[in-house]
Amino acid sequence: MSTNKKQKCKQINKCARIFSVIICFTTLIFAQYQIGYYSTIFQDPDRSNRNIETKIYYPATIIDDSTVTAIGQFPVIVFGHGFLMSWDTYQNVWEEFVPEGYIMVFPTTEGGLFSTDHQQFGWDLQFLVTKIQNEGLNNNSPIYNSVDNNTALMGHSMGGGAAFLAADSLCNSGNNHLKTIIGLAPAESSSNGVSSIASALNITVPALILSGSQDGVTPPTDHHIPIYNNLSSNCKTFISISGGGHCYFANPNIFCDIAESSASNGISISRIEQQSISFDFLNLWLDYTLKRDCSYFSVFQDSLFNSNSITFDQLCLQNPTANIIENEGVLTSSIIGTGYQWYLDNSIIPYANEISYSPNIDGHYNVEVFFLSGCPTISNSYNFIIDLGVLEKFIPINHAIYQNYPN
């Protein structure tokens, strides 16, 4: 190839890469949703019709200057506020996640100075995990037909601790909505005879805890780390933001900031920096656990190992990979999962979604196994050749197979 042609090809390739970046960037911009909002009061019949005022933010679009619910179904994040911190202190949180395609649910209960009941707040969060599913079935609701099954519990400080109380009950009852729990500087809720640290023992869903290294309000060694250590999740991650504080996960709040100024020392990053670091990890984690996109887990892992802004601890057990077992012409996955997909020569076999599959042609077969949490795994290829001896068992006795010789 001539030098001019090589240079021309390089220019074309460079332009193609730039064009691809522009297209991707443009797609990301237009993929962002507007934010819809409404407030409602739910009643919990199991607690004497306790009133639970709830603020709900949801993905929306603007049509003719009116805000309407975006088309689609969106995962849910139920969020618990901190002690003496109103739900609107977390405007930074809903403005981050709702445009990315999440419904955010904020109970406003248990905001008093002397009457705060951590157990009741935990029950409020627990109640909303299932109640919001009913809201999606209510044709008078702004989020009618918009609620996805997958749900996260998330909370800050007191609300973080209460989220672990809620997850304890949900995991024990076998709730199938809760897919992950996230604590932002979660506080040990030891009042009212409960304990977030103790509750962590019963939590099995994937978990993520973010902590500021300089948090003096809920010191990590007394609060965040014991909760993390007690978790029974098969995938859990603890992230310590270097130089971070307790209150910087939220917007300014006079009560939290006064406590921080008297209890925390050595905070060396800004509120904006701490939130930026947090959102980088949270977006990846939520896309992995709630949107079930396993490619984001790989990016999450890369960020953990390459970030200079954090230190971390992690225990994540990988889901097992199946072997294919053949018995009399039937292929079976060696691993039991929640779902299956069989492949022939790297192509999906329609309706082949059971633990076993009976092939009728030669080829290379794989089985993909799905699990309650974590990523699916796919087996090594199995070369299947039809055994005529086995095939004869399925031929009626008054039929036979003959070689078709040419005349």
Annotate each PLM feature.
Residues 67-73, 117-161, 168-173:
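Gly/Ser-rich "nucleophile elbow"/oxyanion-hole loop immediately N-terminal to the catalytic nucleophile
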Residues 175-249:
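The feature captures the conserved acid-bearing segment of alpha/beta-hydrolase catalytic domains
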Residues 88-107:
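Short amphipathic alpha-helix adjacent to the substrate-entry channel of hydrolases
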Residues 341-360:
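Surface-exposed, flexible coil segments in extracellular/virion-facing regions
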Residues 74, 81-85:
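Active-site glycine-rich loops that stabilize anionic/oxyanionic intermediates
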Residues 32-72:
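N-terminal cap/lid segment of alpha/beta-hydrolase-fold proteins
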Residues 323-329, 344, 391-407:
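Surface-exposed, proline-anchored Ser/Thr-rich loop/turn motifs
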Residues 243-245, 252-319:
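Alpha/beta-hydrolase-fold serine-hydrolase catalytic core, especially in secreted/extracellular enzymes
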